[in-house]
């Protein structure tokens, strides 16, 4: 099998999309009744990096995955002593970490029903859990092999491995997926 055969096969695939409701801004996602943009059982983690981290309570609104506060010094005193106070709404651009190779993975289905996933990921245990959950497998049926990666900087987390694994199971053949740089950017990853 070759890339040309894969291209020919891909041309035969018919895809039907079901439009889902969208919350495309933070404000829209936080509004009452907003469509869910994440699984409510999934909590974010590691959002706060710093010496003084306080985690908030876990009774979070539906589209909030984590709440972390960083506190250092006396904020009231800081405002009292400030010569100038600027209040505004700030919008930050998307950040691309610029790792050496884009997202890539290969999934090899075994005769036993087990899968071996070779992934350029920073989260091998999350990847194993997500692949198993997506395919209804036991975690023990999924082996993740992590070769050296050319950087990730927090961006290489589970994204395409469950898709790649599903295709491998459906076809009964190894499946390799590697994004081009433009596909990596368009996939909404990283942050």
List each model region and its residues.
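Structural alpha/beta core scaffold segments of enzyme domains
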Residues: 1-191
């Amino acid at each position: 099998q070759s890339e040309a055969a894969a291209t020919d096969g891909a041309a035969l695939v018919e895809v039907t999309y079901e439009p889902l409701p969208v919350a495309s801004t933070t404000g829209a996602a936080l509004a009452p009744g907003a469509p869910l943009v994440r699984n409510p059982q999934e909590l974010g983690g590691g959002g706060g990096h710093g010496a003084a981290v306080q985690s908030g309570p876990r009774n979070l609104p539906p589209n909030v995955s984590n709440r972390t506060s960083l506190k250092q010094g006396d904020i009231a005193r800081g405002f009292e002593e400030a010569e100038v106070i600027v209040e505004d709404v700030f919008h930050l651009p998307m950040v691309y970490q610029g790792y050496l190779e884009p997202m890539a993975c290969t999934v090899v289905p075994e005769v036993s029903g087990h899968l071996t996933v070779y992934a350029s990921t920073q989260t091998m245990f999350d990847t194993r859990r997500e692949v198993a959950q997506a395919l209804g497998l036991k975690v023990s049926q999924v082996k993740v092999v992590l070769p050296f990666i050319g950087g990730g900087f927090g961006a290489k987390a589970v994204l395409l491995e469950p898709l790649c694994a599903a295709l491998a199971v459906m076809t009964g053949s190894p499946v390799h997926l590697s994004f081009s740089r433009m596909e990596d950017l368009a996939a909404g990853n990283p942050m």
